[in-house]
Amino acid sequence: MAVAQQAWSPGADPAPSAAPVSPGWRGALRLDFARRGERTALVRRRHQGPLVVQRTFHPEGAPCHAYLLHPPGGLVGGDELDLSVEVGEGAHALMTTPGAAKFYRSSGDWSIQRQVFRLAPGATFEWLPMETILHGGSRSRLINRFELAEGARLIAWEMVALGRPGSGDHFPRGVLDQRLAVNCEQMPLLRERLSLNADDPLRTAPWGLQGQAVFATLLASPAPDGLEHDLRDALQVPPGVRMGATRCPEGLLAVRVLGPGVEPVRKTLEQAWRTIREPVVGLPPCPPRIWST
């Protein structure tokens, strides 16, 4: 099926945010998924800059798998990325990334990544990106918002690495402003904000990051009652990794993971996804092909 493509100028409708006020480049991408017969298709994409999706895949029939390509050079101060994804009624899209998103040292301006995901009634969306690496000296703002209509189903995660300890970068300087919102029928299910400086006691506190370099959150909605217990029983957590799961009264499952490195945290997230996919989405696990490369 042909996909409508359009270059996206900053003033075009619907742009996800106003033009940046600080120096730097801007990348923007709008994706629309819709059900076409028995399959979901990427029916429209509008883009500006290097944030792109190339081809899509259907390895499990109806769901559409898409790979988001981040700028290969990463982000520095003043750069902005805007991603807007709409999943139409009854459609099912799964998105991942082939590599990490990287935020580099800033001289003072924020590097900003805004992501908005809108799910129509009966839509299913899985957002399973690779890690976001915050290099020492970066000033990073990560904004994620999920808007769910009635009957929509969601599995999504975000994994953040503070520096690259294996390469000697322990994030000695830098700032993170991380924001997360999940709404269902415009009613809030979850609101979170993390403001973290490199020297924040939260990094080593037992009630915080416990000295770990990598942290992640996985969300799933609607989660059947008791799924958090099934998940805890099923996971084989790698050494050094801490994991907790909570189900909110509204049916939103929140899974938190802490670990010393990207690989063990990612393996934990992938295990969790394999465990909860069928109860939440109604399909057995079908990992994106890129995970095997």
Curated annotation (Swiss-Prot):
Keywords: Chaperone, Cytoplasm, Nickel insertion. InterPro entries: UreD. It comes from the Bacteria. Residues 1-22 are annotated as: Disordered. It holds the Pfam family UreD. GO terms for cellular component: cytoplasm. Residues 7-22 have a biased composition (Low complexity). It is found in: Cytoplasm. GO terms for molecular function: nickel cation binding. UreD, UreF and UreG form a complex that acts as a GTP-hydrolysis-dependent molecular chaperone, activating the urease apoprotein by helping to assemble the nickel containing metallocenter of UreC. The UreE protein probably delivers the nickel. Belongs to the UreD family. Required for maturation of urease via the functional incorporation of the urease nickel metallocenter. This is Urease accessory protein UreD. It comes from Alkalilimnicola ehrlichii (strain ATCC BAA-1101 / DSM 17681 / MLHE-1). The gene is ureD.
